[in-house]
Amino acid sequence: MNSSAQPSRRIASNLLWTPQGLLRNPLVGVAADGRILSVGTCPEPDRCPGTEFYAGVLAPGLVNAHCHLELSYLLGAIPERCGFAGFAGAMSQVRERFSAEQRVQAVEAADAAMWQAGIEAVGDISNGDTAFAVKSRSRIAYHTFVEFFGLRAASAEHLLPLLRHPQTSLTPHSLYSVQDAPLRAIAARGDAPLSIHFMESPGEAALFEHRGPLWEWYAKAGFSCDFLHYGSPAERLVACVPHDRRVTLVHDCCITQRDIDIVMGHFTAPVWWCLCPRSNRYISGLEPPVELLRRNRLNICLGTD
């Protein structure tokens, strides 16, 4: 990439991460507004006037494909390895301990930490308006997935105020927490990508077999599900979401080859499989089957959750 404009910075390093692979001894010209003006090589950066050298690997800005920025205040507040159902239950117990000011401060700190770590774009999940002010003035580019959640919620009307914010779109939380009519309505609405929690725990597949911790939790709480006849989360996904809708499936810890075959046999639009390994280790100790995804040559992205 070359340009007639003069760079305000020249940055050299040992390696540069490019779409074509690693480039040795790179020299990158950067404009004052952050645009990349040129990419070349400089084996001896000491002999290149005005050049900054950083040992290591230069990389483009990173994308955090799945984040719950508004929940940043919960960092360290919930015990490790309590399982998904335990984690969800603990959230409702501890969230009232934090003031609105503490929540906003945690959002600001998390936003700053992501920028410092090289993240320049985030797919953020929102159930409320806590984080929007911070996102509006952040240097990070955010797309906010306004999340529809709840087995007793029949429509997304209560989420309309959140959808008035810039760069937002509606998405269902998961295939186990939304009844059939709202899931189908959301999937048929617009053309923005959907970001769906998928196979984070064994309980998701077990629910469709009328067993497991989610089934027991729902039974105890008096929840009924009108979607268990699909047989599995993957089969429900392809039955309810049009084939040409872009989808990001988040977590994927418990997917099987059959799940992959069902999903990829349906969608003609891109499907991204988003892994959040640190979150999974903290909550359940599970890890996604990375080699299975790689063997199938699937699109993999990363999130912090």
Regions found by a protein language model. Name each.
Residues 120, 159-193:
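Active-site gating/metal-coordination segments in enzymes
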